[in-house]
From Swiss-Prot:
This is Inhibitory synaptic factor 2A. The gene is INSYN2A. GO terms for cellular component: postsynaptic density. Residues 318-337, 449-461 have a biased composition (Polar residues). Component of the protein machinery at the inhibitory synapses, probably acting as a scaffold. Inhibitory synapses dampen neuronal activity through postsynaptic hyperpolarization. This synaptic inhibition is fundamental for the functioning of the central nervous system, shaping and orchestrating the flow of information through neuronal networks to generate a precise neural code. Interacts with GPHN.
């Protein structure tokens, strides 16, 4: 019996009639609705899912379609009973797990909303409280945020010296490398005497004098730069002007250190050399001195009237040299003896620092080699232990003196050692030319490497299996 109430139909017939009609309608609706279509799944399992979904949909539909409370009350038990009976009548084979208890992947869209106790939600209940983790985002999670805050809120005064230091370091590096190249590559004559013989430095010296009468604090940044440029522009220096990059560095350093300069400016009457003899009271002085001497170690002649600072050399022995002494102006264009001596000493000493560096490098490489050899031994030991364990599990006896030619592990580990050895050989190859430069006398006594030239190629040829078997034996000599 179907009663119509404002176009909405409510099922009030007996249970036997309800079931087939409702199910049919539901199934039609289910098939047509794209949202409810279940993705590919085990057929039997799909039936179970379908039943559950249908039961719930039926319940919802009846509730929606019923207007009054009384009708709702009437319809609810009907649909529940129908759904329950249908769910029970589907044959459950042993292979089908009970869906409500299973931990299967959740694929159908509706179950999650309706079954609040669906296993995924019930077991991992803590997932629901995930938003609680959000507040921690704003909290301080270690030193990264600290650093950020410091950068944002910290005073600019703190930031500037840091940046200045960095720039200073870079500049120093650039200058050092430049000096290094010049001292090694240029003959002494080019460095010292030739530039000094030209009459042109007279004007340069005067300009420098005018500059030096002012205290460095008054000396503008561009003038520092200009001076370096003057020096660079001298035709006799026989060197291409260095790239503009260095110039940028210099201005940066000059500007950053301007406050420091004004703080410690010497008296106006003093010439630059007086400030210079106090070996870098402030880094900007250092910078200016380097700027004047950018083009190699040119020995300052008396024409510069001691305006240019003493020579800078990489090695500590050289930096201990006393500042250049004043000679009477009568000496004219001859280079001062101290300058020449210092230049010679520089040339003598620079290779010494190279040797020290190389020795340190060699020491490091030796340490690396020995440590990696130890690592290899340990690894081989581990491999053997594993093999032994496996052998014992299978009831076999395991001796380390086994047939290495046929032992897979031994062959592979030999390959490991081979690759490491190849690496060492290549490194050695790179080092040999340097060693020859250092000891040209011993060149004849260089021991020829026992390895063939092929071994050095960066991509070793793939060895055949028999070959690697052969090598396997003697590669493991140290075990």
């Amino acid at each position: 019996m179907v009663s119509k109430d404002t176009g909405k139909c409510i099922l009030t017939t007996s249970e036997s009639e309800v079931e087939p009609a409702a199910c049919l309608a539901l199934e039609m609706k289910y098939a047509l609705d794209p949202n409810r279509q279940i993705k590919k799944r085990n057929k039997a399992l799909q039936v179970r899912f379908k039943d559950i979904c249908e039961a719930q949909n039926e319940q919802r539909d009846t509730q929606l379609s019923s207007g009054q409370l009384g009708e709702k009350r009437e319809a609810k038990p009907v649909s529940c009973r129908a759904a329950y009976r249908k769910y029970m009548t589907v044959p459950a084979r042993r292979s089908i797990p009970n869906v409500t208890k299973s931990t299967g992947v959740q694929t159908s869209p509706d179950l999650k909303k309706c079954y609040q106790t669906f296993p995924l939600d019930r077991k991992k209940g803590n997932l629901k409280s995930l938003p609680a983790a959000d507040p921690f985002k704003s909290q301080n999670n270690g030193f990264l945020t600290d650093a950020k805050e410091k950068n944002e809120a910290g005073p600019m005064e703190e930031a500037r010296p840091c940046g200045a230091g960095r720039v200073h370091k870079t500049t120093a590096l650039v200058f050092h490398s430049n000096q290094h190249m010049n001292t090694v590559d240029q003959p002494l004559g080019v460095n010292c005497t030739e530039p000094c013989k030209s009459p042109e430095p007279l004007s340069y010296g005067e300009a420098a004098l005018q500059n030096s009468t002012r205290p460095p604090s008054e000396e503008p940044d561009y003038q520092l730069l200009g001076r370096a440029k003057q020096d660079r522009g001298r035709p006799n220096s026989e060197e291409p002007a260095p790239p503009a990059l260095r110039r940028v560095f210099k201005t940066e350093v000059a500007t950053v250190y301007a406050p420091a300069l004004s703080a410690r400016a010497p008296e106006p009457g003093l010439s630059d050399s007086a400030a210079a003899s106090q070996w870098s009271l402030c880094p900007a002085d250092d910078e200016r001195r380097r700027a004047t001497h950018l083009n190699g170690l040119q020995a300052p002649s008396e024409t510069a009237l001691a305006c240019s600072p003493p020579m800078q050399c990489l090695s500590p022995e050289c930096s201990e040299q006393p500042s250049q002494t004043h000679t009477p102006p009568g000496l004219g264009n001859q280079p001062s003896p101290t300058a020449v001596a210092a230049g010679e000493e520089c040339q003598r000493i620079v290779p010494h620092t190279e040797v020290v560096d190389l020795k340190a490098q060699l020491q490091m490489m030796e340490n690396l080699i020995s440590s990696s050899q130890e690592t290899i031994k340990v690894l081989l030991g581990v491999i053997q232990e594993l093999e032994k364990g496996e052998a014992h599990r299978e009831g076999l006896s395991y001796r380390t003196g086994q047939d290495t030619a046929n032992c897979d592990t031994c062959r592979n580990s030999a390959c490991i050692i081979y690759s490491v050895e190849l690496d060492f050989k290549q490194q050695e190859d790179k080092l040999q030319p340097v060693l020859r430069k250092l000891h040209p006398i011993e060149e004849t006594q260089v021991i020829p490497s026992p390895y063939s030239q092929e071994t050095y190629s960066s991509t070793p040829k793939q060895k055949s299996k028999t070959e690697s078997k052969k090598h396997g034996r003697w590669k493991l000599w140290f075990l």
